[in-house]
């Protein structure tokens, strides 16, 4: 049974109903419909913390989806799961792949910055200030890109950039 039929969450149910209606009225191929079904089921599983199931659905959606823009969101969500699992190298890889297909994903730049900042803090705890500065500089570059795409967002990042004199 498709995940959308067994999910008890009202918002997920509403999304599923609207998505099903759109799939019926918007002219799409059967492959596009199937890809979206896997994507939707992946989002549902991810929202419940069922990451293994979500990844299976996202990988199937990637196999079927041909549109680069749509693929960017699938890749982004895979990155989110790897971030949640503490697999930062894999997460960065998927965020990069998402941005290759859609360079207007400020949330991907933000998440990459957060990972780099975290790695900078780890380097400080290990006593390696040179490596830490390198990670912080990389975080700053990603945050600048996120802020450039959505100037009113990422206020904490903007403050950090100003405090650390990395904001131009």
Swiss-Prot record:
Q: Which UniProt keywords apply?
A: Chloroplast, Membrane, Photosynthesis, Plastid, Repeat, Thylakoid, TPR repeat
> Entry's Pfam families?
TPR_1
Q: What do the Gene Ontology cellular component annotations say?
A: chloroplast thylakoid membrane
What is known about what this protein does? Answer: Essential for the assembly of the photosystem I (PSI) complex. May act as a chaperone-like factor to guide the assembly of the PSI subunits.
**Keyword Plastid tagged:** yes
Topology in the lipid bilayer is annotated as: Peripheral membrane protein
Family classification = Belongs to the Ycf3 family.
Q: Where are the TPR repeats?
A: 35-68, 72-105, 120-153
A single BP term in Gene Ontology: photosynthesis
Q: Where in the cell is it found?
A: Plastid, Chloroplast thylakoid membrane
What organism is listed for this UniProt entry? Lotus japonicus
Q: NCBIfam families annotated for this entry?
A: PRK02603.1
Coarse class of the primary localization is: plastid
Q: What is this protein called?
A: Photosystem I assembly protein Ycf3
């Amino acid at each position: 049974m498709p995940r959308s039929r067994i999910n008890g969450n009202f918002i997920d149910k509403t999304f599923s109903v609207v998505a099903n209606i759109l799939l019926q009225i918007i002219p799409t191929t059967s492959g596009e419909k199937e890809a979206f079904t896997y994507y939707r089921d992946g989002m549902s599983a991810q929202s419940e913390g069922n990451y293994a199931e979500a990844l299976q659905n996202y990988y199937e959606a990637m196999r079927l989806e041909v549109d680069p823009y749509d693929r960017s969101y699938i890749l982004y969500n895979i990155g989110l799961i790897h971030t949640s699992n503490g697999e930062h190298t894999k997460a960065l890889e998927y965020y990069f792949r998402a941005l290759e297909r859609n360079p207007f994903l400020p949330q991907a730049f933000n998440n990459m910055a957060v990972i780099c900042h975290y790695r900078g803090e780890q380097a400080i705890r290990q006593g390696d200030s040179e490596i830490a500065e390198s990670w912080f500089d990389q975080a700053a570059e990603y945050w600048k890109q996120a802020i450039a795409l959505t100037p009113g967002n990422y206020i904490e990042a903007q403050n950090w950039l100003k405090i650390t004199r990395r904001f131009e």
